Amino acid sequence: MSKKKEASKISPVLFLDPGGQSMRFYVRPGPTKMQLHPLITSGGGNLCRNQEPGAILLIDPTDATNVTQNTGQKYISTKYILDCVEQNQQLDPNDYAIIIGPSVQTRMALRNQGSGRLGYSSEEDAAILKFIEKRQQDAKGNLVWKEMEKRHVTEHSWQSMKDRFLKHLQQKLADKPTKKSPIKRKPLSFTQSPLRKKKVVEISEDESVQKGDCPEAPMATETGSINPPASPERASSPPEEPQAAGQPSQASSNDSQDETCVLVIETPESENPRLDEDAPDASNEHSSLKKKRRKTCKTSTTDSRSSRLEEDPVGQDIPDESNAQSSPKKKRQKACKTSTTDSRSSRLEENPDRRDIPDESTEQSSPNKSQMTSKISTSDSGNPIGDQGCDNPHGCNANSSPSKTRQTNSEASTPDSKKLGILAKAAKEFEDSDVMDDSEECENPCEVPIAEPSDAQESSATPATLVREPESQAEHHEETQPDSPMSEEERPGPSSAVVPPSLNSSTSCSHIRETPEETLSRDLLEVKEQVINLMRETKKDLVEVTKALLKASGDLKRAQVFLLNGYDHETHGPLWTRLDDETLLAADPYELEQLQSKFGEEEVTRRKSFLATDVK
């Protein structure tokens, strides 16, 4: 409030020049500027933001020495504005001028003032020389001079002292004569150093070796501490056969090798020829011991094999994998194919009711399953040794892979069959299998599992597909048959791949049995024909036709209208949604009433019967 009162008392022409223009002032930003701004503006003056030419520079007298130290400009004290406002008249600004410029002063005046550069006295030079005399190598660095400044050797800065020494005092220090002080030398001690002690010990050992041929036993005891302990492999190895009297044991040979290594390092050159002569003997002994160990390992493996064969006599007939792999594969494949065709034809002659049943399980079975059943087929085909081979656990494990199954099936036979050729042996096996099949069918005709296909598959099987099916199944069977020849006893039913199409058609016509499932399949065929006809009439795909049937609740006429003319909500009514179907199947009475009010009772019953039909 006081500042506003003062500003109101100031005349508006206080800071106008004789021409009637407002005076311009410049003050550095700060509290002083905030104080003077209302006074200058109320008096008619202007306060510039930047320093402009012709503007009066105002400055606080307390800040004049710090701000305008090196400038020669003319500054007016802020007291000028305050005095003009107090007296309410324009005063002369030159009376308040503050001129701070570079002034020329003498050395003596600077010394009296206590500021500026001072000269060096003789005492200061002597102190510098005395301090730097012992540190001449560090004189060109900075650390020594900084330390002198810390210790206050002189009142000058460390840069000044360094400059003084390098320019004026360094020559004086070089001209000074240096006095050599007598250095006290320590008396020489003739005690032996640890390195010399080692050399003396080595020389003494060499001399002892040269003088007398020491026995190998004490050397082995000395080097025993250096040698590493025996490996666990040596400790766990089985006991070897007794060696000859002239040959040392393996442990002694190893020790002798360790001894030779130590002697080569420690003994002088005169001992080297003798050691080189002993080295071949040790190596020969070591190689002979290795050969003996291999022989013992072989004998142990043969003994273990013989013991296994004694425990499992059937395993003797199983050959090695290398012998099995060398046998020809193509002949084996041909024999397997002929065996399967002959056995199937004989079965079909005996049981004609099973000809029309397609064997889809054999098509969908994996190669691994066919490999597992192939092992059982050889055992059922009349080979007694094959039956015994499955009881052997080692034989079953060996037959896990497809290659091993082929080896065991082809080569696990009697000694008489080995003499015969492959084709003759296969024919003999087929005869035995036919005999076994006849006996088994007469005793237990119901034991053979018959895999009946689903009704949907039977109904969808048209004559064209029945003709194509044997060809595709035959190709698939030829691919899987060489790897895994399956027996007829283990298969779910006879495959239609081998049966001709004429047999299929004739047997299917002569052996038709009327069952509820077959009637259902007939209904399914009729529905299928109707859907195909609807697709032809409307020229729509199966997806569109199926959607229309779902909308029409299975009504073919309404579905045809939907496909041809489209759906109209006003004429056809609301459509059933998935949520409506779920509520209908839930059979909640309250929700059923809502559905009946929405669709009508007839439509609800029709939809319910449509959703309840289970077509397989």
From Swiss-Prot:
Gene Ontology molecular-function annotations: telomeric DNA binding
One Gene Ontology BP term is: positive regulation of canonical NF-kappaB signal transduction
- Give the record's keywords alphabetically: Activator, Chromosome, Nucleus, Telomere, Transcription, Transcription regulation
Residue span of motif Nuclear localization signal: 597-613
Enumerate the PROSITE patterns for this protein: BRCT (PS50172)
The protein's job, in short, is: Acts both as a regulator of telomere function and as a transcription regulator. Involved in the regulation of telomere length and protection as a component of the shelterin complex (telosome). Does not bind DNA directly: recruited to telomeric double-stranded 5'-TTAGGG-3' repeats via its interaction with terf2. Independently of its function in telomeres, also acts as a transcription regulator: recruited to extratelomeric 5'-TTAGGG-3' sites via its association with terf2 or other factors, and regulates gene expression.
Q: Please state what the protein is called.
A: Telomeric repeat-binding factor 2-interacting protein 1
Per the UniProt record, the source organism is Danio rerio (Zebrafish)
Gene of this entry: terf2ip
